[in-house]
Amino acid sequence: MLFRSAAAAGPVHAVRVDSQAKYALVARGDADAYLRLSPDAAYAECVWDHAAGALVASEAGCTVTDAHGVPLDFGAGRRLFGARGIVCAPPRLHARLVDALRPLLG
């Protein structure tokens, strides 16, 4: 979770939040973004860990994709095979995050 700092140019604060509350925090505007990246490129997230939260964030106007900017496919099975990481953020920030992640993902 990336929480807003008191000063606009202040430090980024990473905070651990359990369950799908992380999506709700971004949807409410209490957090700037939610990024989830596994060091293992072959790892596939479980659908049930993200589907409801992604829906809440999307309905609030956020963009939720994998780290390459590809929409998540929750209807393709129990796991998000082919999706590398997760990025949830308001549209004004989402594209910038995906662009920043490209060099890291290869």
Could you say what each language-model-derived stretch is?
Residues M1-G106:
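An extended, acidic
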